[in-house]
């Protein structure tokens, strides 16, 4: 099921791309944030030429530098807490923010990535409930050399923000970078894949002028 969802990735709107970039939804704000993303992506990729290694480096940077915001998770998550601008500024977010930042960094390097919404195992969802469970998570998949590569930067990270404190609850892992489809299916069930073009978000403002 997971792979079949990727093959049917749905297009999204320019307004949604802009909204994932910044909650201000201004042309200047979008441009400024995307400039930051492009600069950071170049910094992370450095002299790496191989697309797979670029993908790996970006995934590792996100997992090593962004904290999972449990305080936000336990309350009502706002657009401000998941937009790329504020994720970069605060270094904390929930799964949607991880997914947005990772995919935007990849887009800046010319990598094809989709954002995946679905169900994962949790305190309230076990394996037997995955197929029928609530949509409670977002992660990514990249297409390189005609092969889909699953990436979950949240599940690779042990950095947490809780009770207004940044903490580490153990060493990070790369288990959920290029995890096999079979292994992923034990705790992730994809429901929908979205294709976003953050660097075309300016189209939204052009549409408003016509």
Q: What is each of the regions a protein language model found here?
A:
Residues 99-180:
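Hydrophobic/aromatic-rich core segments of domains that either
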Residues 2, 11-16, 26-27, 78, ...:
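Serine/threonine-rich low-complexity intrinsically disordered regions
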Residues 2-91, 100-103:
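Secondary-structure boundary elements
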Residues 160-210:
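Alpha-helical and coiled-coil interaction segments, frequently adjacent to or embedded
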